[in-house]
Amino acid sequence: MIPVVALVGRPNVGKSTLFNRLTRTRDALVADFPGLTRDRKYGRAFLSGYEFIVVDTGGIDGTEEGIETKMAEQSLAAIEEADVVLFMTDARAGLTAADLSIAQHLRSRQKTTFVVANKIDGIDADSACAEFWSLGLGEVYQMAAAQGRGVTNMIEYALTPYAEAMGIERQGEEEEVDERQYTEEEAEAEQKRLQDLPIKLAIIGKPNVGKSTLTNRILGEERVVVYDEPGTTRDSIYIPMERDGREYVIIDTAGVRRRSKVHEVIEKFSVIKTLKAVEDANVVLLIIDAREGVAEQDLGLLGFALNAGRALVIAVNKWDGIDQGIKDRVKSELDRRLGFIDFARIHFISALHGTGVGHLFESIEEAYDSATRRVSTSMLTRIMQMSQDDHQPPLVNGRRVKLKYAHAGGYNPPIVVIHGNQVSKLPDSYKRYMMNYFRRSLKVVGTPIQLRFQEGDNPFENKVEKLTMSQERRRKRALSHIKDRKK
């Protein structure tokens, strides 16, 4: 299972700076979907061969009252469920009462914790960090997150216990690796492997949108409520099922619930459990509450699913019992705020009464089939050439970018690898045009599609051009001319 790293600390110690550095993406087409919220608190990270989820907990001010407030509840839950906690402090400001309070809480939880003294640039780091040893949480790691100093070493050290599970052999400093990109043969093997496995479906959404009700409706039985007991909060529940001859595994992120009153069951929402479920799924079913419309939390979950490359279906729940005026307003909001994912099917359902639930699986199968359908190299190359014929690549330094051929580089999500000359200099607008061209040509529905560009080898790169004898003579004459003029 992919490890989760939680960033903990009082405000203004650099959590967001480190979060942004860790979750940066090299391909704007993966993360830069217009319309997505920019204020993300969780994301996927790839660094030095490690893949992990990073969570900016926020919401903890270090005071005893603050830790017990509703605002801090989600942050504390994230700390509980994280595999590694990075406790960030400000080396310039020194040790504060808030730091001591947070450290006391972390010690009581016995989490794998690393103390990070941030903002060490321009100061005597050893002297500034000495007092943080008194927190009693072990070694203090120095970092300047804004400049990137110490970030890679910190992550490597913190995630070393997970290296074997990820198949990573540590051999000193490494650059970031490109995720999930295969050769043509490896991509074909991956596609065959996916075809033999059941479809993993993660049902996600913010609290109380009807995830549990929909899960029960799909399974056709009333699930037993699972109470909070030690050891039950870490993982989602995996439920195998068969429908119309096809095997599924439902990943139930709402499986753990707590009873607050005798007759009332309140769903316990866990961000980390949801993120892990998305990582492990083939298809994500995002539930939106029709009565509340598209919330920022919906967009955050949607963004994570897209960045993970998962096939996607959206269900607008509680559609029954609302008047036509509200329905029209909700549809208008969906068009406005979710227009950037026009490839995903949207269904209007009632999980409670079962209205529209049956049609969900048609879209789930369609999305999965699109995400895992094999496409030949000849077909992909032909589509690439057609896109060039319709709209030529721009000139770069007076030369036309030349695209040579394309092949499959992975599935779920579908990855198309395009080889050519100067492809690294293609503007994002042309890359986005090509991505949409491939989507239309392949009739891809319900899944994001990713393009990777690989530069062709240039045999003349880094070679000094050797002059002919006549060119050498002209060069000498020109140089002597210049010297005479200076005299």
Curated annotation (Swiss-Prot):
It comes from the Bacteria. Keywords: GTP-binding, Nucleotide-binding, Repeat, Ribosome biogenesis. One of its GO terms (biological process) is ribosome biogenesis. One of its GO terms (molecular function) is GTP binding. Residues 373-457 form the KH-like domain. Signal peptide: none annotated. CDD domains: EngA1 (cd01894), EngA2 (cd01895). The keyword Ribonucleoprotein does not apply. The keyword Phosphoprotein does not apply. GTP 1 binds at residues 9-16, 56-60, 118-121. Residues 3-166, 199-372 form the EngA-type G domain. GTP 2 binds at residues 205-212, 252-256, 317-320. PANTHER family: GTPASE DER. GTPase that plays an essential role in the late steps of ribosome biogenesis. Associates with the 50S ribosomal subunit. This is GTPase Der. The lineage of its organism: Bacteria, Pseudomonadati, Pseudomonadota, Gammaproteobacteria, Alteromonadales. The gene is der.
